[in-house]
């Protein structure tokens, strides 16, 4: 204090330093915590704020923080609860190594006023380090002469932990030669050694593999291992040994010099120089040292002179083997050599007059070559016999002594074997006999006896329609088993007529590569299947050929937009005018948009969407997603606009989808005005009374005609059904073609187009479908029908169906037919018979119930084609007394409903084309008939409304 005054410091500054020093002493208290190493993130260490006497609310305000010089990120404080916790991995061995004490020093600093606290966190050791040896394998070299109880030091393991976790104990794997000596001083091993319990024998056990395991004292225990490889060093304590003590060898008298007589082999179980063996001749009896030699390194005994059977028949050779140890050790054996009298001249073979190559169509007994043999020996040793390679189509025929002919024994096939390597063997009669061989190569010349062959008799190809001209659609390949020009294959079309056009106008085939090209764009709507043949011809003489059938299926693409069908109140694509009474309730069907799509499958599956009104205003109408029926969403009231312009977007399910737009003009009128206005709209400039008379006349005519047809059809069908026997198969020629069907739900007529299937049998054919609806029991007189268009076909004459006739998806799902085809001979005959499906797609399907929608038959399947399906049983057929819900007037867009519905039902009223008249309930119609004066007023109002539209 006085020192500061001597330096000239003023009293105020001195007081400030004293104040700071006082705060420092107050806040410099020290806390102690402990935490185990490797603790997880978030592990609780201590309530540091509580232990320091700090309030939790003031930690943030006073800028509470923790600082450390070296390891500040290991621990962290939660300012919300004042708890010190582990922030990151703590490794004691990394922090403090082998030190007995390990701690982390933290400084806790708070401001306002400034205070510094010292926190000491002790890191406790856990047993997380196993014992580790410095080497994976320790090698020990021990001589086999070492005495028992000999000691061999080992290098111990180390443990990075401390105290009990680093206290190691050792154990040795079980063995009969060594034990482990591990004396301790109470804390750690002083010296680790192996003790030899039993003398080693290198010849029995050249090396030992032991496993030394070190275990620490932690909880749980951790271990470490090292492999001990003990190699036993050799001592020269074994003699060289031969395989046998005596050897017997037979040797020809004409054996040449350096001929190997015998190779001796002596082994010494010692190793190194103690196991190296040298050989030496001790004696040869009778006197024959000049006849044989012995290689001292490899033990080979060889002929060194000329042997003579008549001079000596046996030789006895004594051999010694000596190792290079100190002192050297030796082994002995005896070799007996027998001299044999042999046939020393081999036969000779000569092949002449070869007739090669041989054609594969050569006849048996054809002479291929002449063979002669000879032998310079005499007697039995000079008698020679010949033989040929077995299992070949050739044989040797002896013509006279020592002459043979090589002839063909059986037919040749070059495709199986194109060449033969024959071996002619000549053997004499000596003992042992000598032989000689001669090789004859016989090549088989090819003959064109194999036609080109395709991998399979028929190929199926799928091509998308609208392909570019010259498009490569397939490649045919035929293989000819012959060779050279006989295997050279060229391709061509099997030309024929497809209707009025040649096949070559559709496709072409490259003569060399076999690639098939489409010469023009294919149209799925015109041609679904193109069947033709491709011929493969070789270049042989005479040429051979074969055909393969190609079935080219033209896949549909979405290239046709939906087409709107003409209605009674407007043309296709034009606006349709509809009058709706304001008194109708929710769900009342206002109109129905009909459309067809010339594509197939999903490309022809249509959906309907009502476009939002201009200005975003909400309209009280909706359209069925798959039926096209426009109905009210709620009851109409006076607040609704008297006129609505509805835009219905018709969209198919192709990729990309194509659309069409229909316009429906809806006028809201009073309840009594709708029927009269509809009548005048239908009649146009004609008088209302004349229009109503025409409608009634046409309706009565249509009902009478259809009723007559239904009665006739039902009688004919019943007679055929009961007259048919259960064993009938296909219809005999001359029986009428009959298609009986039953519809479930509403069904309408759609556009029927002619589908051409081009096959190789005759000209293209067009499927003919005939529908014979059942006769209704009675027709409700008050049910409003539809008139039949003038000019309808005569009942006996076929007519192209009206474009407004098409089967709905729900109808197809529930429709089953019994089909009799005269030409194809297909007849339903009990279980297993053909089951006809009607894969057509219609825009006139009714609104599905409970959100169910009848899907299309499937993408790529034409909606107007016939598909015969052979199933395990027959579907239920409609009986003579069962009636369909509706029937169709052929050649007319009229669809007559004979369902018995409630009087107030408005369901499916839009399925009828009423020539501009909206159908009301029967109760409303009766009320309208009773009030003629009100009807005249409605006519005037309807005229005014139509003029406004």
UniProtKB/Swiss-Prot annotation:
6 X 4 AA repeats of P-X-X-P: region residues: 733-893
InterPro entries in the cross-refs: Cadherin-like_dom, Cadherin-like_sf, Cadherin_CBD, Cadherin_CS, Cadherin_N, Protocadherin/Cadherin-CA
Molecular function GO terms recorded: calcium ion binding
Sorted UniProt keywords: Calcium, Cell adhesion, Cell membrane, Glycoprotein, Membrane, Repeat, Signal, Transmembrane, Transmembrane helix
Parts of the chain on the Cytoplasmic side: 718-949
Membrane topology: Single-pass type I membrane protein
PROSITE patterns recorded: CADHERIN_1, CADHERIN_2
UniProt topological domain (Extracellular) ranges: 30-696
Glycan attachment points: 265, 304, 547
Region (Disordered): 753-807, 826-949
Keyword NADP: no
Cell membrane recorded as keyword: yes
Record field: transmembrane: 697-717
Principal location class: membrane
GO BP terms: cell adhesion; homophilic cell adhesion via plasma membrane adhesion molecules; nervous system development
Role noted for this protein: Potential calcium-dependent cell-adhesion protein. May be involved in the establishment and maintenance of specific neuronal connections in the brain.
Protein name per UniProt: Protocadherin alpha-11
């Amino acid at each position: 204090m006085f020192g500061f005054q001597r330096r000239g410091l003023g009293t105020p500054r001195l007081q400030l330093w004293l104040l700071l020093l006082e705060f420092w002493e107050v806040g410099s208290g020290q806390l102690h915590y402990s935490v185990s190493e490797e603790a997880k993130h978030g592990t609780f260490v201590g309530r540091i704020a509580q232990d320091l006497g700090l309030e939790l609310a003031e930690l943030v305000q006073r800028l509470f923080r923790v600082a450390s010089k070296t390891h500040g990120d290991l621990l962290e404080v939660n300012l919300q609860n004042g708890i010190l916790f582990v922030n990151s991995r703590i490794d004691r061995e990394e922090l403090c190594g082998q030190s007995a004490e390990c701690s982390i020093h933290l400084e806790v600093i708070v401001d306002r006023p400034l205070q510094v606290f010292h926190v000491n966190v002790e890191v406790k050791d856990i047993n997380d380090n196993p014992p580790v040896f410095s080497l994976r394998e320790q090698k020990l070299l021990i001589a086999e002469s070492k005495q028992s109880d000999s000691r061999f030091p080992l290098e111990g393991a180390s443990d990075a932990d401390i105290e009990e976790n680093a206290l190691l104990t050792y154990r040795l794997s079980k063995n009969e030669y060594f034990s482990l000596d591990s004396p301790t001083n109470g804390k750690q091993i002083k010296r680790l050694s192996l003790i030899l319990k039993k003398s080693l024998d290198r010849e029995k056990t050249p090396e030992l593999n032991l496993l030394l395991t070190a275990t620490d004292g932690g909880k749980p225990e951790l271990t470490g291992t090292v492999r001990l490889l003990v190699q036993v060093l050799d001592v020269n304590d074994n003699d060289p040994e031969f395989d046998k003590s005596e050897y017997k060898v037979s040797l020809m008298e004409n054996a040449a010099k350096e001929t190997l007589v015998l190779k001796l082999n002596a082994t010494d179980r010692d190793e190194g120089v103690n196991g190296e063996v040298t050989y030496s001749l001790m004696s040869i009896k009778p006197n024959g040292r000049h006849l044989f030699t012995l290689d001292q390194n490899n033990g080979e005994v060889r002929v060194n002179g000329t042997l003579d059977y008549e001079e000596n028949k046996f030789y006895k050779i004594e051999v010694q083997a000596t190792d290079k140890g100190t002192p050297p050790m030796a082994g002995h054996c005896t070799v007996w050599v027998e001299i044999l009298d042999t046939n020393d001249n081999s036969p000779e073979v000569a092949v002449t007059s070869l007739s090669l190559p041989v054609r594969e169509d050569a006849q048996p007994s054809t002479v291929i070559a002449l063979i002669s043999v000879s032998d310079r020996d005499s007697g039995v040793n000079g008698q020679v016999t010949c033989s040929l390679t077995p299992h070949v189509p050739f044989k040797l025929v002896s013509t006279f002594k020592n002459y043979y002919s090589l002839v063909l024994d059986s037919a040749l096939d070059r495709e199986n074997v194109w060449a033969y390597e024959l071996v002619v063997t000549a053997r004499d009669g000596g003992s042992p006999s000598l032989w000689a061989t001669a090789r004859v190569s016989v090549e088989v010349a090819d003959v064109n006896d194999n036609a080109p062959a395709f991998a399979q008799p028929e190929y199926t190809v799928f091509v998308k329609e609208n392909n570019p001209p010259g498009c490569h659609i397939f490649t045919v390949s035929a293989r000819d088993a012959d060779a050279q020009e006989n295997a050279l294959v060229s391709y061509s079309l099997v030309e024929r007529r497809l209707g009025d056009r040649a096949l070559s106008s559709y496709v072409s085939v490259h003569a060399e590569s076999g690639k098939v090209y489409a010469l023009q764009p294919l149209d799925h709507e015109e041609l679904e299947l193109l069947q033709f043949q491709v011929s493969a011809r070789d270049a042989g003489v005479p040429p051979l050929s074969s055909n393969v059938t190609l079935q080219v299926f033209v896949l549909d693409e979405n290239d046709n937009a939906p087409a709107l069908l003409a209605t009674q109140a407007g043309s296709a694509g034009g606006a349709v005018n509809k009058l709706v009474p304001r008194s109708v309730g929710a769900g009342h069907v206002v109109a129905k948009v009909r459309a067809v799509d010339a594509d197939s499958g999903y490309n022809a599956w249509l959906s309907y969407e009502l476009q939002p009104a201009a200005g975003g205003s909400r309209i009280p109408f909706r359209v069925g997603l798959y039926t096209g029926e426009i109905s009210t969403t709620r009851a109409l009231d006076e607040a609704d606009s008297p006129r609505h312009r509805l835009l219905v977007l018709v969209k198919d399910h192709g990729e990309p989808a194509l659309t069409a737009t229909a316009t429906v003009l809806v006028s809201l009128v009073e309840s009594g005005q709708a029927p009269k206005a509809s009548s005048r709209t239908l009649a146009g400039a004609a008088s209302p009374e004349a229009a109503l008379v025409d409608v009634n006349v046409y309706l009565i005519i249509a009902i009478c005609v259809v009723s007559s047809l239904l009665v006739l059809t039902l009688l004919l069908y019943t007679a055929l059904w009961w007259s048919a026997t259960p064993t009938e198969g296909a219809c005999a020629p001359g029986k009428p073609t009959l298609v009986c069907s039953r519809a479930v739900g509403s069904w309408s007529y759609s556009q029927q187009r002619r589908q051409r299937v081009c096959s190789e049998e005759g000209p293209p054919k067009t499927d003919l479908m005939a529908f014979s609806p059942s006769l209704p029991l009675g027709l409700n007189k008050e049910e409003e029908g539809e008139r039949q268009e003038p000019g309808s076909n005569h009942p006996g004459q076929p007519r192209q169906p009206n474009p407004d006739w098409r089967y709905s998806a729900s109808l197809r799902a529930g429709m089953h037919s019994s089909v009799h085809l005269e030409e194809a001979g297909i007849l339903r005959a009990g279980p297993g018979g053909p089951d006809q499906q009607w894969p057509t797609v219609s825009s006139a399907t009714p609104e599905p119930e409970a959100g169910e929608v009848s899907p299309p038959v499937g993408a790529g399947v034409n909606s107007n084609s016939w598909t015969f399906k052979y199933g395990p049983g027959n579907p239920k057929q409609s009986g003579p007394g069962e009636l369909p819900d509706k029937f169709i007037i052929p050649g007319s867009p009229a669809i007559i409903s004979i369902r018995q519905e409630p009087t107030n039902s408005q369901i499916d009223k839009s399925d009828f084309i009423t020539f501009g008249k909206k159908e009301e309930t029967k109760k409303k119609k009766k009320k309208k008939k009773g009030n003629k004066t009100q009807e005249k007023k409605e006519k005037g109002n309807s005229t005014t409304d139509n003029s406004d539209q």
